[in-house]
């Protein structure tokens, strides 16, 4: 029987151990999609206790606590931070089989040097030990990022954001590039309450009068230019339901005007607006050399009662089951036939779409940029051992795993970089197992080069992010 979480955790053979310890483990991290706060990074936010750094905003943990019968008072309610931590500690033993059990103990070990298992009995001791370390300094937001060997962090930012803290961080003595990620979801949701008010925010941010749809597009392009100047090289779109239809400005202009006058768009009109707007943005990304991320098939805010009480991103989302192949293919083709298809990363929250996405990527590779169209890493509910393995094997079966740009955290937590370790261990075990089974050659130099590429170098070449001078040496 193997000990829990030992040095060879998830590594089942000698080849995988060599690949991980000699090639993957020491590679820097390019975290090209996360939800960290640039303000907190700039201010090197400190944390008064373990609950603040670990449980605030972490809806993965919140879902597990609710499933374990924990009252909302001890999750998002008025209970003290220590009471909330105790409630989480009672839940942790019940998460065996869920990656939360692994992540929890990896984070305790890697950041705080605590090997004890967290449960109700160990909770007081762990609470005290971690809080002592947090109070002693060296555990601010920047410190935690640097401890994790991170080279680049890309945040998730609305087009109207000032990017004040990204700009300030450029001049800071901080060995990590913190870059903006362009997330124009509010520009797409024409029927969402507050759309017109958001357009006015866009007007202010761009310094441009928005009197019609053409002005709207110009203002969005203005903000893309602004993000580019701040180091932005990537966009992200949350597309809960993929839709696409051929249309043009003459059809969409009156739809935009209608909504700005307080009316709602019909489903057909909404599809036309989203199709043309996303197409326009795609051409802008291609002109700038950006990568476009599409996160597809999430079913969000399913409990209307709790959405009204707590708002979005609080643990009430699920996997959607929309068929995505035809509309996604039509959208990508609309850009490709105009030679305006940017580097694109496709994610689906539904694991049944793995083979669809892997095959679709191959339809639009251009023979110039290696892995131009990427099957994005396992996302959210698939951010598990099985989910990561399924995504990697699907990509390997149908595309080129060797050109994969690897892992991201997609997290609001400064402790989540252990997910990169988790991914790297699984990657090395997949490849190592092929070798042990005689399905791949025992060529450590070749395989090590592939592993280093997936862990770091492929993303570095793919995105071409600005790197601080001190990191180039």
Curated annotation (Swiss-Prot):
Q: Which InterPro entries match?
A: Metal_Hydrolase (IPR032466), Uronate_isomerase (IPR003766)
- Identify the EC number(s): 5.3.1.12
Q: Which residues cross the membrane?
A: none
Known catalytic reactions: D-glucuronate = D-fructuronate; aldehydo-D-galacturonate = keto-D-tagaturonate
Pathway the protein takes part in: Carbohydrate metabolism; pentose and glucuronate interconversion
| GO biological process terms, semicolon-separated | D-galacturonate catabolic process; D-glucuronate catabolic process
Q: Which Pfam families match?
A: UxaC (PF02614)
Keyword annotations for this protein? Isomerase
Q: What Gene Ontology molecular-function terms does this entry list?
A: glucuronate isomerase activity
Superkingdom in the source lineage: Bacteria
Family label: Belongs to the metallo-dependent hydrolases superfamily. Uronate isomerase family.
Q: Tell me the NCBIfam families matching this sequence.
A: PRK02925.1
Query: By what name is this protein known?
Result: Uronate isomerase
Q: Which species does the entry assign this protein to?
A: Bacillus licheniformis (strain ATCC 14580 / DSM 13 / JCM 2505 / CCUG 7422 / NBRC 12200 / NCIMB 9375 / NCTC 10341 / NRRL NRS-1264 / Gibson 46)
């Amino acid at each position: 029987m193997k000990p829990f979480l030992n040095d060879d955790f998830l590594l089942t053979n000698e080849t995988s151990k060599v690949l991980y310890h000699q090639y993957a483990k020491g590679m820097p991290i390019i975290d090209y999609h996360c939800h960290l706060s640039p303000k907190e990074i700039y201010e090197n936010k400190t944390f008064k206790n373990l609950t603040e750094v670990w449980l605030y905003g972490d809806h993965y943990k919140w879902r597990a606590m609710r499933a374990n019968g924990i009252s909302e008072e001890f999750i998002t309610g008025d209970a003290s931070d220590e009471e909330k931590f105790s409630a989480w500690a009672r839940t942790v033993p019940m998460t065996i089989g869920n990656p939360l059990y692994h992540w929890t103990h990896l984070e305790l070990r890697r950041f705080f040097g605590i090997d004890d298992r967290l449960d109700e009995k160990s909770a007081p001791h762990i609470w005290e030990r971690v809080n002592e370390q947090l109070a002693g300094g060296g555990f601010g937001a920047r410190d935690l990022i640097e401890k994790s060997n991170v080279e680049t962090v890309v945040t998730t930012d609305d087009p109207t954001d000032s990017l004040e803290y990204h700009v300030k961080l450029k001049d800071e003595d901080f060995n990590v590039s913190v870059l903006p990620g362009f997330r124009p979801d509010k520009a797409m949701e024409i029927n969402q309450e507050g759309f017109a008010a958001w357009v006015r925010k866009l007007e202010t941010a761009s310094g441009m009068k928005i009197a019609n749809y053409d002005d709207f597009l110009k203002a969005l392009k203005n903000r893309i230019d602004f993000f580019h100047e701040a180091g932005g090289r990537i966009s992200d779109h949350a597309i809960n339901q993929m839709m696409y239809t051929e249309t043009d400005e003459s059809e969409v202009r009156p739809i935009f005007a209608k909504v700005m006058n307080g009316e709602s768009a019909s489903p057909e009109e909404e599809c036309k607006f989203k199709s043309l707007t996303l197409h326009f943005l795609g051409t802008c990304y291609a002109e700038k050399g950006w990568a476009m991320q599409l996160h597809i098939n999430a079913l969000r805010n399913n409990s209307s009662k709790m959405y009204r009480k707590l708002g979005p991103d609080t643990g009430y989302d699920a996997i959607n089951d929309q068929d995505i192949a035809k509309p996604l293919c039509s959208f990508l083709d609309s850009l490709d036939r105009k030679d305006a298809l940017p580097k694109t990363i496709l994610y689906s929250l539904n694991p049944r779409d793995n083979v669809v996405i892997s095959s679709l990527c191959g339809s639009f590779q251009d023979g110039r940029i290696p892995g131009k169209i990427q099957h994005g890493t396992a996302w959210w509910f698939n951010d598990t051992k099985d989910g990561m393995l399924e995504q990697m094997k699907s990509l390997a079966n149908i595309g080129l795993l060797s050109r994969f740009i690897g892992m991201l955290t997609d997290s609001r937590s400064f402790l989540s970089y252990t997910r990169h370790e988790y991914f790297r261990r699984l990657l090395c075990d997949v490849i190592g197992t092929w070798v042990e089974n005689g399905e791949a050659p025992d060529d450590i130099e070749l395989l090590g080069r592939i592993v280093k590429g997936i862990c770091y170098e492929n993303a570095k070449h793919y995105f071409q992010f600005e790197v601080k001078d001190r990191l180039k040496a």
